[in-house]
Curated annotation (Swiss-Prot):
SMART domains named among the record's database cross-references: HOX (SM00389)
Protein name: Homeobox protein BarH-like 1
Gene Ontology CC, one term: nucleus
Residue ranges for the DNA-binding region feature of this UniProt entry: 142-201
Composition bias, Basic and acidic residues: 230-254
GO molecular function: DNA binding; DNA-binding transcription factor activity, RNA polymerase II-specific
Keyword Nucleus annotated: yes
Gene name linked to the record: Barx1
Family: Belongs to the BAR homeobox family.
Region described as Disordered: spans on this chain: 1-20, 204-254
């Protein structure tokens, strides 16, 4: 039998060059101690241990628990703000770039496609999409342009207004076609002209307005066509004319 001290005796210990795999005894049940590797054999390079510790800090619970310097957080915030202000201030839905950024790619789902955008841009895109999809949203009506009448049109309207303060539908159609205007233009002009006419009547000493509160004419306030023709005939007869006795006197003198 060979004794352990004799040369050539079998060795029952771990071979040389192999690490000692003895069980590591934990001093506590903390997560940090469980995740950290047991101390290496004596003589191991401290640089390798530091590198392994750095790798552990990048991933896992240790990275969350590790204290980071304050200036790194400021740098990250500044970088995110700079990325936000690089985008144009115009609404994203109105530009091709914004719609391309907010829409998902052909091989990429919607949420994953927009996850690379800053939070401000994502929220702005959602608000615009919600605002444009409202069913009750109405577009603002543009203000109508003021109609500019020609001199001939104004003369025709004034002449007709002197005779007829209110137009029926057939009369309005005939007047609009004769002057080259639309029915709405003739109707609007008549309404404005009647308002002016009422003011003139009241300022001229009239005690009452020639029309009712709703705008309809009162009885006997507007002359009929027969009355107008009689008034014209009376004006013609009132013109100075030669007396029948004058030519006979001249003949006598001759």
């Amino acid at each position: 039998m060979q004794r352990p001290g004799e040369p050539g005796a079998a060795r029952f210990g771990p071979p040389e060059g192999c690490a000692d795999h003895r069980p590591h005894r934990y001093r506590s049940f903390m997560i940090e101690e469980i995740l950290t590797e047991p101390p290496g054999p004596k003589g191991a390079a401290p640089a390798a241990a530091a590198a392994a510790a750095g790798e552990l800090l990048k991933f896992g619970v240790q990275a969350l628990l590790a204290a980071r310097p304050f200036h790194s957080h400021l740098a990250v915030l500044k970088a995110e703000q700079a990325a936000v202000f690089k985008f144009p201030l115009a609404p994203l839905g109105c530009s091709g770039l914004g719609s391309a950024l907010l829409a998902a790619g052909p091989g990429m789902p919607g949420p994953a496609g927009a996850s690379h955008l800053p939070l401000e841009l994502q929220l702005r895109g959602k608000l615009e999409a919600a605002g444009s999809g409202e069913p009750g949203a109405k577009a603002k009506k543009g203000r109508r342009s003021r109609t500019v009448f020609t001199e001939l049109q104004l003369m025709g309207l004034e002449k007709r207004f002197e005779k007829q303060k209110y137009l029926s539908t057939p009369d309005r159609i005939d007047l609009a076609e004769s002057l080259g205007l639309s029915q709405l233009q003739v109707k609007t002009w008549y309404q404005n002209r009647r308002m002016k006419w009422k003011k003139i009547v009241l300022q001229g000493g009239g005690l009452e307005s020639p029309t009712k509160p709703k705008g309809r004419p009162k009885k006997n306030s507007i002359p009929t066509s027969e009355q107008l023709t009689e008034q014209e005939r009376a004006k013609e007869t009132e013109k100075p004319a030669e007396t029948p006795g004058e030519p006979s006197d001249r003949n006598c003198e001759d």
